[in-house]
């Protein structure tokens, strides 16, 4: 099963090892938006940046293409979500993946978006 993971899931993984025992049948993906969010923290120690880069090097990262951009624009016409969330949601929809997030409230009103608050067992 392919699953797009939100930035907050990666942060929770860094803090608590959330993804350490993930079933190998789950293929985890990250939006390029989440990559940006992870790398933008000001004052990040070199060790933290190295840890993030190591994680990113083994993670499948999905770029924004025209179909994702158009889907994000379409969603954004009728909703007040922040642009990064629109791109993450649009990526999940266009790639036909559920979005694993702790910020369900930010995404729950988006049609055709399958949300996961935890990984299936």
Task: Label every PLM stretch briefly.
Residues 1-30, 40-53, 121:
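Short, well-structured N-terminal submotif of metal-dependent ribonuclease cores
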Residues 8-9, 33-36, 67, 105:
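Alpha-helix/helix-capping structural signal
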Residues 1-2, 89, 93-121:
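Acidic, PIN/NYN-like endoribonuclease modules and their adjacent C-terminal/linker elements
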Residues 10-11, 39, 108, 116:
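Nucleotide phosphate-binding site architecture
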Residues 3, 27-29, 57-58, 62, ...:
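Short loop->beta-strand "edge-of-pocket" segments that line small-molecule binding or catalytic clefts
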Residues 36-39, 53-56, 73:
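Amphipathic alpha-helical segments within well-ordered protein domains
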Residues 14, 60-102:
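Active-site neighborhoods of divalent-metal-dependent phosphate/nucleic-acid chemistry enzymes
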